[in-house]
Amino acid sequence: MDSLEEPQKKVFKARKTMRVSDRQQLEAVYKVKEELLKTDVKLLNGNHENGDLDPTSPLENMDYIKDKEEVNGIEEICFDPEGSKAEWKETPCILSVNVKNKQDDDLNCEPLSPHNITPEPVSKLPAEPVSGDPAPGDLDAGDPASGVLASGDSTSGDPTSSEPSSSDAASGDATSGDAPSGDVSPGDATSGDATADDLSSGDPTSSDPIPGEPVPVEPISGDCAADDIASSEITSVDLASGAPASTDPASDDLASGDLSSSELASDDLATGELASDELTSESTFDRTFEPKSVPVCEPVPEIDNIEPSSNKDDDFLEKNGADEKLEQIQSKDSLDEKNKADNNIDANEETLETDDTTICSDRPPENEKKVEEDIITELALGEDAISSSMEIDQGEKNEDETSADLVETINENVIEDNKSENILENTDSMETDEIIPILEKLAPSEDELTCFSKTSLLPIDETNPDLEEKMESSFGSPSKQESSESLPKEAFLVLSDEEDISGEKDESEVISQNETCSPAEVESNEKDNKPEEEEQVIHEDDERPSEKNEFSRRKRSKSEDMDNVQSKRRRYMEEEYEAEFQVKITAKGDINQKLQKVIQWLLEEKLCALQCAVFDKTLAELKTRVEKIECNKRHKTVLTELQAKIARLTKRFEAAKEDLKKRHEHPPNPPVSPGKTVNDVNSNNNMSYRNAGTVRQMLESKRNVSESAPPSFQTPVNTVSSTNLVTPPAVVSSQPKLQTPVTSGSLTATSVLPAPNTATVVATTQVPSGNPQPTISLQPLPVILHVPVAVSSQPQLLQSHPGTLVTNQPSGNVEFISVQSPPTVSGLTKNPVSLPSLPNPTKPNNVPSVPSPSIQRNPTASAAPLGTTLAVQAVPTAHSIVQATRTSLPTVGPSGLYSPSTNRGPIQMKIPISAFSTSSAAEQNSNTTPRIENQTNKTIDASVSKKAADSTSQCGKATGSDSSGVIDLTMDDEESGASQDPKKLNHTPVSTMSSSQPVSRPLQPIQPAPPLQPSGVPTSGPSQTTIHLLPTAPTTVNVTHRPVTQVTTRLPVPRAPANHQVVYTTLPAPPAQAPLRGTVMQAPAVRQVNPQNSVTVRVPQTTTYVVNNGLTLGSTGPQLTVHHRPPQVHTEPPRPVHPAPLPEAPQPQRLPPEAASTSLPQKPHLKLARVQSQNGIVLSWSVLEVDRSCATVDSYHLYAYHEEPSATVPSQWKKIGEVKALPLPMACTLTQFVSGSKYYFAVRAKDIYGRFGPFCDPQSTDVISSTQSS
């Protein structure tokens, strides 16, 4: 057992702080061991929980016990029985002798032996898993354990059946005997206790032998002789055991006769002699272990043993019990086996005490193992050496066995005293052994349960059989619980909760054993081997002390059990196991109940732990299932999203193809002759629109309607232009040429000019100068590409001839896009001419390249990319107008051109040139943008005319553009997303168109935004979103729009209704420029029109004009970047964003004086992006330039607008969140959208003073489509 003990000890130590996982692993190991043991001892199950083993059980146990004997022998060798015997001897002396005598006696006198043996075995088993006692004996004796058990259980029949009886009798009635044995007083005290007593005290011989241990020499049964009286005592003990004795005899015969007697005799003799010498009780005990058949010879020692055993068992029970409880619970299978062995022991013990048997049963697994090892060891080493070493080993083993015997111990009340002594004897070894039990206890629930039963057995030896049975049936028995409950009260001392079980058991057992050793001293003795020796002496001298020990032992074991239970519980709960602990426990007669309670607690806890484990396992399984299901759902969602996107793209491609076809069909309505006035152009455009289709017709009608308004718009445009740029105003004057020049300067100047330019353009008036008609046409043009002012590469939009829009790609190469509406075309044509010259492919996106010739002029504009863009656009517009008859429309086209190259921003502007025109514009922009983003071109194209939309299709974006109308030029070049944008932001730009001026301004702001729009729209939707260009950068478009817008605005409104594009058109712009703002007001109406729908508007022609104008404006606007509200400090949240104007910003009640020196937060630039992996939209925003004069931003407020065909009111903008300000750029992801819907998003900043900055230009996106992917 030494070897065993040490490894186990190591294990235990490892376990001290074991986590649940470690414990589980240990449990698994133990289970395997148990299973092996089970295979070795099939009886385990039989005698498992109830001490009563089937007669067969003992036999099996006996086999096991035999093995155990060897182990015990080895263990004995490992431990110097004498060394430990002395310690153990206090209890063990008697115990050992008793055990051996008992065992021998048990063999001889099964009844006593069983009882005594039971206790002894229990103690032995605990010490040397009585298994040795009965096991070997049992094995040999056929029932030493069995014999005892068998005898008690089988042979004893009494013990077994009588377990209570035999145990009672023998054990003092396992139950009663246990109590008696354990108590030495309970009814079976006579038999059990008496036996025990007899053994111990009653059996003076036993006692004498036990104390004398010389008797052990008298190996009557091996130990009988060894135990002094072993035979006589066995006899007397057995006799004392009475029935047990007679019962035991059978068992004894088996045990003693077989192994018990012979082996016990020999082992006991050897061990007994050794034990005798050493306190045979230990050696005997060990022998008992060793012989396990010898245990049969433990009748006499049984009494003492019973007492010591009881105590020992109690201690063991407590410690081992606690340990064993875990161990047993863990190793319940093991326990079963052990029980078999122990049951054999228990058989002996059981004979002695049913409880013992039960304990044995519970304990047996461990005991069995230990016994096996012990027996093997003992056998291997030789009985004498074995006995002495065994004593120590047995001490260890006893500890293990004791822990194994915990159950035994429990049922060992009788044995308790003996056990106590044995335990004390085995304390040293038990410490190590106990560690193992503790480990086992810690790890296995089985052991724990078993331990519980053992513990309950300990408390009530008499009751134990029943308890054991109860425990077998249900781990917690009321009596056990009672005992556990009372234990703490009695003398429950727990040094460390965590360590209680293991440590407590280890040291506690030792201490308890020591204490038990001196029953009287038990309380006073802690970790006192000397006390143990004294106890031994006392036991030897006094059976009473043994009994006392038994009691104290019991008490201790009970309190220990309680400690163990609690500590175990704690340990289990905390997942930390500390094994080192010493506890003094003093218990009185009610220990049994207390122990029972403790055991019940332990069992309940174990059950709870098991249930928790099962629950955790089930929970983990459920979690995995749920995860799998969720994963599947996610995959499905992704699939549906992808499918929806594919479907959308398919539709767009189809639309684009149709657009291309249409374009080819009416490539360009003959462009208005250059000479034609804008009005002419407008007429042409109108015609074109009609030709183009209903959308165009609508646009046209809108245009016509707008035409009257245009003048006023123009005025605003002019105003805007003046505000934006002086030159633009000039342009506004409607001198396209003028505008052109203005554009250049103004472009550079900033978006302002663009507005005027736009005005000019819008005013088609430019050429017509006053011509409202042209203006109107421009409006239809809502195309107002938002050419980003940046369009400086106006070249982009060059139209080579009226029919064609020329898009200068960034490179500046010209791309001709045929404009559908001839009028538009003609306008464009003129423009194109200019554009070509313009072609500063400067358009490189940044430069507001006014698509139109103006743009070429724009080169200057290029210089000032954003600002310029507008100007340039304006210029192009002017140029276009001038060149092309002032038709301007064409100019617009260039404007559209404008931004793509310039800035995506401008494009973003989205020229909301007339709702549809947007679409055209978008298309145009697209065309333009191609270079930039296609958007610009489309925008231009759009502006050029509805055809523009067609051209957009050409661009590729074009496809979307017509229907989409909102091509999203806003994308401006970079953001081919413009088309998307249209959805989300583009509309805003379109709005801009409506209020051309405002738009312009916004446009510039938009510029930043365009990226937003552009991202989604340009590609697929450019045509669609045409205007959506949202050329953020190129506010140009807006600017252009602005002029146009004014004209357009009104028109846009009308056409807006026709084309929703209007909606978005205006909005963006207004934010961009103050003048625009005014325009915006007008635009609002337009805005209200759903700019988005406008996309559909074929109006491109009109759009075209508008676009040009818009572009022009855009040039100025670029600074504004329509998309970004910031530019328009005046928060115009309510601007007709897409479907509805943004909500007004509440004014803080009071501003601190510091706020006066700071300006409102800047207008952010918003970009949208689709998240492909999940159905989400990423909003990212930043500012174009950091304004140091602004107050610190506290948070950003996000608003969302779900587009609905019904009324559009600011209240439809819902605040979806507030994000604490972090260093820009910032981004957040939104999810959970209604698929197939269009959403608009806007962001505004709130500074630390509670003031709200302007909204960014709203950005739109289709939830299902990937338009918005930027």
Swiss-Prot record:
The keyword Repressor applies. It is found in: Nucleus. GO terms for molecular function: ATP hydrolysis activity; transcription coregulator activity; transcription corepressor activity. Residues 1160-1270 form the Fibronectin type-III domain. The modification N-acetylmethionine is found at residue 1. Recruiter that couples transcriptional factors to general transcription apparatus and thereby modulates transcription regulation and chromatin formation. Can both act as an activator or a repressor depending on the context. Required for HUSH-mediated heterochromatin formation and gene silencing. Mediates MBD1-dependent transcriptional repression, probably by recruiting complexes containing SETDB1. Stabilizes SETDB1, is required to stimulate histone methyltransferase activity of SETDB1 and facilitates the conversion of dimethylated to trimethylated H3 'Lys-9' (H3K9me3). This is Activating transcription factor 7-interacting protein 1. It comes from Homo sapiens.
